[in-house]
């Protein structure tokens, strides 16, 4: 009986240590994703500016119209990538917050 009483807290401590390590990994992953998202925001803004500039020149000739279409396609693709990254980041952070809450309830004592 004494062995069971001693083993339970030790197993719980190991579980909490694993949870803490997992939380740190997820936090690093979220930080990396957030940084990639910020970089992509700058790229989307630059692509949007390029498209606006090209669109203003559309009616000056066929080459300008092709350039406007090309820059619009690139801009739309970057916006889609940004939306995907933003969605992934929000999901990851929501999951991380839930995991932190569970960790705090189970492993953190006052």
How would you describe each model-predicted region?
Residues 1-6:
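Bacterial N-terminal signal peptides
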Residues 14, 109-110:
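Short, solvent-exposed mixed-charge patches
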Residues 41, 65, 92-94:
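Alpha-helical interaction segments
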